[in-house]
Amino acid sequence: MTAPMRQHLSQQGVLARDPLPFAVCALGISQITAWGTSYYCLGVLAGPIAADTGWSRSLIFFGFTLALLAMGLVSTWTGRAIDNHGARGIMSFGTLLVSAGLVALSRVQSEAAYLAVWVFLGVGMRLCLYDAAFAALVQIVPSRGRTAISYLTLFGAFASTVFWIVGHFLNEALGWRQTLVLFAAR
């Protein structure tokens, strides 16, 4: 390719596209769905789960508490894994874990299984939520990591708003178990 052609293509944005907007938008959509389908799902589904299973709301939210504890317990390992292997693969694996966990959660019949699935979900959430996404942005645009992280958090702020509405609609139409299966397909 000749120098004038390269300069023309670069001016048109074909060769020298800034990766920041695409990375923020792609990870932003990923974070909206990740937070909405996992972290915020009980905001809508706790009541229907309690009504269907007869379990107390305390037990239902205790499951989420166990997820938070699991997230804390694997944080150091997660950080090391991201540093050693990059964020993309870790986030992808976390997304698979969360999807599997949501399907498992939709199938639980006992309190013990319910609580165990939340521990599993906690591990998956740690691998695919903000921590890994922030690291991914810094790996993509190291010199503008702070800016990218600020933009990404704006996307994440919409997760509860979007998924409480979506979750309520799906629960009314399909029930909580099928809603979780659809959330898993994210």
Question: Where do the language-model regions lie?
Answer:
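Glycine-rich segments within core transmembrane alpha-helices of 12-TM secondary carriers
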Residues: 143-164
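Symmetry-related core transmembrane helices of the 12-TM Major Facilitator Superfamily/SLC fold
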Residues: 178-186
